[in-house]
Regions:
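Short, charged early-sequence alpha-helical segments and their helix-coil boundaries
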Residues: 40-68
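Generic structural signal for hydrophobic core residues of well-folded globular domains
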Residues: 18-21, 34-38, 61, 65
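Catalytic phosphate/metal-binding cores of nucleic-acid and nucleotide-processing enzymes, i.e., regions
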Residues: 27-41, 45
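N-terminal acidic leader/helix
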Residues: 1-27
């Protein structure tokens, strides 16, 4: 079983990036754009990545540099 304590740090990081990079988008809009980008640009099905890889992809999509 995956560590249930992973969800809040993941969600906090996602919320921080969302509010800093795309504050005008609704969550559904942001996720739709991200999922399409993953599919078309990265050739990845977003169903499969664990949270670490998901966040790496999300940061790349949002243009977040390491250390930001």
């Amino acid at each position: 079983m995956r560590d249930p304590n992973r969800t809040y740090p993941f969600c906090r990081e996602l919320a921080t990036i969302w509010s800093e990079k795309y504050p005008d988008l609704r969550f559904g809009q942001l996720m739709y754009n991200f999922i399409v980008w993953c599919s078309n640009t990265k050739k990845r099905d977003i169903f499969f990545p664990e949270e670490k890889e998901f966040m790496e992809l999300f940061k790349e999509f949002c243009g977040v540099e390491e250390g930001e």
